[in-house]
Amino acid sequence: RPFDWPAQGRVSGVFGSQRILNGQPRQPHYGLDVAGPVGTPILAAQSGRVVLAAEFHFFGRLLVLDHGHRVHTLYAHLSEIESREGQEVRQGARIARMGATGRVTGPHLHFSLGLGPLWLDPRPLLPG
């Protein structure tokens, strides 16, 4: 089945939008942002294996799932990570909680879809 929405909330950022920082154009936005309250459940958009659960300056708390065939999803700015590296997760399983960690202006989930080294717009694969 296609991917599920990883969180409930309002879409606050779309794939490919141009980012401006200190008046300077930056790289395009390589994900979909879903805004909501801190603690909102984050669900696995598709079944897979947790290959990274860590914290970074920009992305804050971050999870990456490997879905096979070089497809992976990235979940960033999490308040809590509820999965561990190496764990197999089913589509729709709670894997984390929405937060405002890393470089953000408010609580949201940054959700990215990768195919090998390429970032793709996840929206066409999500319901509705």
Task: Please name every model-derived segment.
Residues 4-128:
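Catalytic cores of peptidoglycan-degrading enzymes
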